[in-house]
């Protein structure tokens, strides 16, 4: 009998040991730490901050440069951390589950806690880049070096997801073609303006600084006013600053407008007599764009912007 008990005891102990080992294995797998990718295949990527050895297939990416979050999500990359602005983008609704809010994107400590295997930052983040490089491979990206389509292709090349980029681009081209037909029929050759206010300052945007400009002027081929073309498209950083008195010279037949940020001060611009006397205002052709949603230029945001622009100009 004692012999039987010993056998049963040994068997029971073995089962406990197996269960414990299985639990440990599941625990490490669910954590998905960056150590999993330390032995993964890497390659040298030429970034703005030099040559960086990064994993070929990153598993835990922290996107500190908020404008690039949607690019990585489109490419199916697991993003574990992103700045607060990302969570305010209406076009990301339902697309930030499981992503940690890292605040204003400057906290190195929050990044450490996320144990990333790749970090994406702006080139303007300066001294922080050196600190971040000690945590994980860090790639600095210059905001205006590439347009949104070329940037998507570059991130796809970086992460080995070219197939997903091409799939999205094919889908995007079809959406643009369908929208272009509808919009051209509705507005013809009439002019379109994109404006934002920051206090009393008024900014008029061209095709290369977000705010839906690439969609309106490049993809859809809609017309800008003469001065918008001269000051915000053919020269400058993609926008120009104007005074209230100059507003009528830049205003198109249709205007997409809004404050610089949600709840921001418009400096009384939209209540001024100059604004109210614009033809677009009097004809009901002013459309209020979401300042955060239209700040982003990634594929997810572009799809939302295209839908808003199409609905606005064809209703």
From Swiss-Prot:
Function statement: Part of the ABC transporter complex FhuCBGD involved in iron(3+)-hydroxamate import. Binds the iron(3+)-hydroxamate complex and transfers it to the membrane-bound permease. Required for the transport of ferrichrome and coprogen.
Q: Which UniProt keywords apply?
A: Cell membrane, Ion transport, Iron, Iron transport, Lipoprotein, Membrane, Palmitate, Signal, Transport
Species assigned in the record: Bacillus subtilis (strain 168)
The record describes its membrane topology as:
Lipid-anchor
Q: What is its main location?
A: membrane
This protein is called Iron(3+)-hydroxamate-binding protein FhuD
Q: What biological-process GO terms show up in the record?
A: iron coordination entity transport
Signal peptide range equals 1-23
Positions of transmembrane segments: none
S-diacylglycerol cysteine: lipidated positions = 24
Q: Where in the cell is it found?
A: Cell membrane; Membrane raft
Q: Which residues form the Fe/B12 periplasmic-binding domain?
A: 60-315
Instruction: List the GO cellular component terms.
Output: membrane raft; outer membrane-bounded periplasmic space; plasma membrane
UniProt xrefs under PROSITE patterns: FE_B12_PBP (PS50983), PROKAR_LIPOPROTEIN (PS51257)
Q: Which Pfam families match?
A: Peripla_BP_2 (PF01497)
- InterPro entries assigned: ABC_transptr_periplasmic_BD (IPR002491), Bact_iron-sidero_bind (IPR051313)
Xref: Gene3D superfamilies? Nitrogenase molybdenum iron protein domain
What family is it from? Belongs to the bacterial solute-binding protein 8 family.
Lipid-binding residues (covalent, N-palmitoyl cysteine): 24
Q: From the UniProt record, report the name of the gene that encodes this protein.
A: fhuD
Subunit composition and interactions: The complex is composed of an ATP-binding protein (FhuC), two transmembrane proteins (FhuB and FhuG) and a solute-binding protein (FhuD or YxeB).
Taxonomic lineage of this organism? Bacteria, Bacillati, Bacillota, Bacilli, Bacillales
């Amino acid at each position: 009998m004692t012999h039987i008990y010993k056998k049963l005891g040994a068997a029971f102990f073995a089962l406990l040991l197996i269960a414990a080992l299985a639990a440990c294995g599941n625990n490490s797998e669910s954590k998905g730490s960056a150590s999993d990718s330390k032995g993964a295949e890497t390659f040298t990527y030429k970034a703005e901050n030099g040559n960086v050895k990064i994993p070929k297939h990153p598993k835990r990416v922290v996107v500190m440069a908020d404008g690039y979050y949607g690019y990585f999500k489109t490419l199916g990359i697991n993003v574990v951390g992103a700045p607060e602005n990302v969570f305010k983008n209406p076009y990301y609704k339902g697309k930030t589950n499981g992503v940690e809010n890292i605040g204003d994107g400057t906290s190195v400590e929050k990044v450490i806690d996320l144990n990333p295997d790749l970090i994406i930052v702006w080139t303007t983040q300066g001294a922080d880049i050196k600190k971040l490089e000690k945590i994980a491979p860090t790639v600095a990206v210059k905001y205006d070096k590439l347009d949104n389509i070329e940037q998507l292709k570059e991130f796809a090349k970086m992460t080995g997801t070219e197939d997903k980029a091409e799939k999205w681009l094919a889908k995007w081209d079809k959406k643009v073609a369908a929208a272009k037909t509808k919009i051209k029929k509705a507005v013809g050759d009439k002019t379109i303006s994109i404006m934002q206010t920051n206090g009393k300052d008024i900014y008029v945007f061209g095709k290369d600084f977000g705010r839906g400009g690439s969609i309106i002027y490049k993809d859809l081929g809609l017309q800008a006013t003469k001065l918008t073309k001269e000051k915000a498209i053919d020269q400058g950083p993609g926008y120009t600053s104007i005074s209230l008195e100059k507003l009528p010279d830049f205003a198109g037949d249709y205007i997409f407008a809004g404050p610089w940020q949600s709840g921001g001060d418009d400096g009384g611009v939209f209540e001024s007599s100059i604004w109210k006397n614009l033809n677009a205002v009097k004809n009901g052709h002013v459309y209020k764009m979401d300042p955060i949603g239209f700040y982003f230029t990634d594929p997810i945001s572009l799809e939302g912007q295209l839908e808003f622009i199409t609905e606005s100009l064809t209703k």
